[in-house]
A protein has these predicted regions:
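Charge-lined substrate channels and their catalytic hotspots, especially those that engage the 3′ end
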Residues: 1-221, 228-257
Length: 257
């Protein structure tokens, strides 16, 4: 955490909201967070970098504090349910840590209708007693549409669903030929019969098994691909891999690593 000089020490951290209205400031390098009562949140938004002061530690328990300044907002877009009124609308966030509905002025609804799941871009974070304001930038679908709930999760966590063209082009070119340099220091098992145990729609075929006879005993081989041999550091493939450390398995789809 960062501490400012002066009579009252200010502590910088990340605000984590609770659906009941209070929250906590998480300070880097500190084991204990700071409890922020609802009346001391002062308009802070989930994920904001904030400055707070310690107001006490009643009964020797967890430190309590008050947010005195919002340093920066981290959340730019929110997924939620659009509710239309007469000449304006609101988006009710899926994530209940966003404690206020988002006001959508007339003309900023992008054609969304009542009951649509949408992505809203925040244009104002509001004040202590004022709602945040935003504009709809994407309509996911109606709340009752099949798959709308899963796609809302994808959008909420900003999961990458498409590979950039440059990455796809690089992927096509690598690994087609095995050079002598690739073989150096490795045991060549290309004449062994190996199988992968993956579904038909799997993309990351990076492991396989084999079964051979050795002195009247079965030898089970487990083979793991050395993917880094084919991915050059700081290439488009390498940068994309940094964003996709693991595959994401959802109810009706897989977003591959």
């Amino acid at each position: 955490g960062k501490y400012s000089k002066g009579q009252t020490k200010r502590i910088t951290g990340t605000f984590q909201a609770n659906i009941r209205g209070f929250g906590f400031v998480m300070v880097e390098g500190e084991d204990e967070d700071i409890f922020i009562p609802g009346e001391n949140v002062n308009g802070a938004f989930q994920g904001d970098e904030v400055e707070c002061i310690i107001t006490g530690a009643p009964g020797g328990k967890r430190k309590e504090g008050k947010i005195v300044r919002i340093v920066s907002h981290q959340v730019k877009k929110i997924v939620g349910l659009y509710e239309k009124s007469k000449s304006f609308g609101f988006v009710r966030p899926d994530n209940q840590r966003y404690l206020k509905d988002i006001y959508i002025p007339a003309g900023k609804e992008m054609g969304a209708m009542d009951g649509h799941k949408v992505v809203v871009e925040l244009t104002s974070y509001g004040q202590e007693h004022a709602k945040p304001e935003g504009k709809i930038v994407e309509i996911i679908g109606h709340v009752n549409d099949p798959g709308a709930d899963i796609l809302s999760i994808v959008k909420d966590y900003d999961l990458p669903t498409e590979f950039p063209e440059k990455v796809l082009n690089q992927a096509v070119r690598v690994g087609k030929d095995v050079s002598e340099a690739d073989c150096a220091g490795r045991l060549d098992l290309r004449d062994w019969q190996m199988v992968t145990i993956d579904g038909e729609d799997a993309k990351d075929l990076d492991d396989a098994v084999s079964l051979t006879m050795k002195d009247e005993n079965y030898q089970l081989g487990v083979h793991i691909a050395d993917v880094t041999n084919y991915v050059q550091e700081k290439s488009a493939l390498d940068r994309e891999a940094l964003k996709r450390g693991t595959s994401v398995y959802l109810a009706d789809r897989v977003i591959p690593m």
